[in-house]
Amino acid sequence: MPFLNDLLEQTRRDASSSAALNAENCHPRAIVETHQRSEDTLQSRFRFDVAAVMQVVRNEVLGQDEALQAIEDVLTVVRADILDPRRPLFTALFLGPTGVGKTEVVRALARALHGDADAYCRVDMNTLAQEHYAAALTGAPPGYAGAKEGRTLFDQALLDGSQGRPGIVLFDELEKASKEVSQALLNVFDNGLLRLASGEKSFNFRNTLVFMTSNLAADEIRQHRLGPLASLRRLLGLQAARRERLPGLVRRRLVKRFSAEFVNRIDSTVVFNAIEQEVGERIVELEVSRLNRRLAKHHCRLQLDAAVVGKLASEGHDLEFGARALKRFIRHELEVPLAEYLLGNRIPCRAEVTCMTVAGHLERGRIRFSLPT
């Protein structure tokens, strides 16, 4: 029966968590003996392939090698299951300009771990700009309507994740929430639990990867990589020295916006770079591959020549607005003309052909399409 299977699965998770807590109180010699009894196989609550997960993430998020390496390091430690079992698995703050892939990393992780890009709990912090909106996280206080129900924005099933794979929660655009809302997360960072204001229940984050995104210090990050003097600094070999100063600049901006105790509880602050023009062609190719997945239901696929890819990458690049601006340009210059072409031309049905290739090429500076003869 389904409910018995769910109960059994929950019992297994509770047993794994209890074992992790008990391991912390064991003598080191007992831990070594436990590992020896496992016949050189590390016993872990988690069963996922770090390399396979990162391959998916790297295919989806381009131009952020340093940030993705930091995430891979974290997943390696999580997979080994050697983290403090009384805290969330990991808390990270993603900083960078808009449109550089901060949220896309979380979606790619959810897809790689759980098979669904939406298999994570997302809290849009820009909707919690007023201090009384902290109730959306901690529930209504005792005596208020809905206190006993304990309704919040969290879903414990998403926080728990799936069997052998951690859950994911994203607090998006953290800087737009009121200070009271962000302070409500301190207990989550400390011991992995969020007790509701009513005291009726708690949400457990101890099996969860906690991510936050923010555009704070975006100007400093952009100037560091692509400012007017960036090329000169690279030429003179001064880029490394400026890179060393960047974490200090970012930290000062964080402390101005958030309390020191809040910043001090974040495990890692990951800086995302502005999207450089050299990455543009790879982003275009990624978007075309996604478009081809959507075109599969029409039994056709799109193939662009190098000139079209170069045109989209160069003319669609926008330093300030990142990949989103490029995607809008692709929508206007490629997807709209392609849709008009598909509606105005007969595409052979499945009985006539398995998959038809639509070729895209430049003609007098505009993208044109044609079917093979």
What are these model-derived regions, one by one?
Residues L83-V123:
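Walker A/P-loop
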Residues A112-G143:
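AAA+/P-loop NTPase substrate/partner-engagement loops
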